[in-house]
Design a protein with these regions (language model features):
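Intracellular loop-helix junctions on the cytosolic face of multi-pass helical membrane proteins
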Residues: 1-18, 147-148, 154, 176-373, ...
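Central cavity-lining transmembrane alpha-helices of secondary-active solute carriers
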Residues: 59-80, 169, 382-395, 489
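Intracellular juxtamembrane helix-capping segments at the cytosolic ends
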Residues: 132-148, 457-471
Length: 552
């Protein structure tokens, strides 16, 4: 009997077009709203804005982005345990649409307080919607490919990534133009319409999708109640902090201490209760790293991994070792995201103090329909996705191929840190000129955008590659969730720094100042040095059997 030959199916799954179309429209809606958000919060009341200070607007903006990258944990749980990926994407998208709708209602009110309340409700719904579907969409696309179509996945994800930048590029061009012509109501409303279209496109393909059923969770109600309790507790703490004379410093410190204590108790209880020598590998595998750290405190001697090896299987120990090393690298990444996401906040606020680039002659004929008579700070944000679409193939197919094995993932990421830091040196120099009273063109911002975007490609794209190749097979989804948390942590860092170094405090400049930009540049350079030192000691994961790894 002849052995059947392995065949390849070169036909794309027909449902992929619905997923890619959904992603392009969703990204247009998200970045279109995000691109005008800083200007809306700081804009004059007569022009429909909220007239906030730069510091307050920066804090709110980055808390919103933080929520966008923290809520994927909720979306992943809903997807894996209750609704499945299709159900989660569809139903959570409705909250997303509602958030845009709430923001679009701002023109119906004249009271600044009413508009601010709408802003809070709208951003909360959008954060839950955008974050909730984030871990589901790309994984759902992977579910559509059969084993004989695996060779098509790289091209499909390339189209997926291109759709993200395609949607964001045009949103930074079109939405500011709508804002100038029709006000913030339509500028927030059109992204909502695009999100509704994205949801409809996704729903239309429902009969073609391959769906992975959720595993279920018998304790889901307890977990939901616990989460609701946390939210209500947070609201209560916020009320106490704002309505009483309790020092915010001591309140935050006490809450932080209680959080650390709760985490320590949870870790001790977990590693006493779980024994992976008797149980199948589950989510307890990645806490082996914590176990190795806490065992010496509890009186055990020997190396950290010797202590862990007394309780965990070689396979679990291997997962703990690889996860611990990856998390050590990830711990330094948030500072980059603190820089990168300010391109939509403080950079826009800086650009609003610069002179718009007037379009004349050929340039007006070619680009006047997109930009109008001039390119402003909000339009300049389109520089980033445009550069990404150029730099990714240039670096991947050119630079990386040329230097070969010398361009390791960690070397790329370390280089990206210093390049991103240098972009803020340029931004600080531009801000010094503005503070000196010079009238400079917003076109100057293209220069730091080149360096910041290069840093993004070197760190973001490479970081995903590094995490995927270095994580144990069963831990890849967990590691990807930690990667998203680095973005959340970076934006939380900006909010904290802006609050602590508020311009209202004596001796501190505002969020948009040369001193603040240099602070971020110096901080990133220092972290870059630490990153290089740690990367030099990093041992890349090899293919040694788990039994050999356990003997280390």
């Amino acid at each position: 009997m002849s052995t059947p030959s392995t065949t390849r199916n070169d036909r794309w799954p027909p449902q992929i077009k619905f997923i890619v179309g959904n992603e392009a429209c969703e990204r247009f809606s998200y970045y279109g709203m995000k691109g005008i958000l800083a200007g809306y919060m700081t804009g004059a009341i007569l022009k429909g804005g909220l007239n906030m200070s730069d510091d307050r607007a920066t804090t709110i903006f980055h808390l919103f982005v933080f929520a966008n990258y923290f809520t994927p944990l909720i979306g992943a749980w809903l997807s894996d345990r209750l609704f499945g990926r299709y159900g989660t994407i569809l139903w959570v998208s409705l909250f997303y649409c509602a958030g845009h709708g709430v923001l679009a209602m701002n023109d119906l009110f004249t009271s600044v307080d009413a508009k601010f309340n709408l802003l809070c409700v709208g951003l909360t719904l959008i954060a839950f919607g955008a974050g909730g579907i984030k871990p589901c969409v790309s994984a759902f696309m992977g579910d559509q490919f059969k084993p004989d179509q695996g060779h098509l996945m790289q091209k499909a994800y390339g189209a997926f990534y291109f759709s993200i930048n395609f949607g964001s590029f045009f949103s930074f061009i079109v939405i500011p133009r709508l804002r100038e012509a029709y006000g913030y109501g339509w500028a927030f409303g059109v992204p909502g319409i695009l999100m509704a279209i994205a949801t409809i496109i996704f729903w239309v393909g429902r009969k073609h999708y391959q769906r992975v059923e959720p595993t279920g969770d018998p304790d889901w109600l307890k977990k939901v109640m616990w989460m609701v309790g946390c939210v209500l507790g947070g609201i209560g703490i916020w009320y106490l902090k704002t309505k009483t004379s309790i020092s915010g410093f001591w309140l935050s410190g006490s809450l932080g201490g209680l959080g650390i204590l709760a985490l320590a108790i949870f870790t001790v209880r977990l590693h006493r209760r779980v024994d992976t020598r008797k149980e199948k590998l589950d989510s307890s595998a990645y806490v082996v790293w914590w176990y190795g750290l806490t065992s010496p405190i509890m009186g055990k001697t020997g190396s950290l991994w010797d202590a862990a090896s007394q309780r965990f299987t070689p396979k679990s120990l291997d997962h703990g070792i690889s996860t611990g090393r990856i998390l050590t690298i990830f711990a330094l990444i948030p500072v980059f995201w603190a820089l990168f996401d300010q391109s939509n906040s403080t950079w826009v606020l800086q650009g609003n103090k610069m002179v718009p680039l007037q379009l004349t002659g050929f340039w007006k004929s070619a680009f006047g329909w997109f930009f109008g008579d001039a390119i402003n700070a909000e339009n300049m944000q389109s520089t980033n996705p445009a550069l990404v679409m150029i730099l990714v193939p240039f670096l991947t197919l050119g630079v990386y191929q040329w230097f070969g094995r010398y361009v390791t993932p960690l070397r790329r990421m370390g280089c990206g840190m210093f390049i991103a830091a240098f972009s803020y040196v340029i931004v600080a120099w531009l801000q010094q000129r503005i503070e000196a009273g010079e009238q400079i063109s917003v076109a100057w911002q293209a220069l730091p955008y080149v360096f910041l975007t290069t840093g993004e490609v070197l760190i973001s794209a490479t970081g995903l590659e590094f995490a995927f190749t270095q994580a144990a097979p069963e831990m890849k989804s967990t590691i990807m969730s930690f990667w998203l948390l680095t973005v959340a942590a970076g934006n939380a860092l900006v909010s904290i720094i802006t609050s602590v170094l508020s311009s209202d405090a004596a001796g501190h400049s505002g969020a948009v100042s040369s001193g603040r930009f240099m602070l971020y540049a110096g901080m990133t350079a220092i972290v870059g040095v630490l990153f290089v030192l740690i990367a030099m000691r990093y041992r890349y994961r090899d293919t040694a059997p788990a039994a050999q790894l356990a003997a280390r």
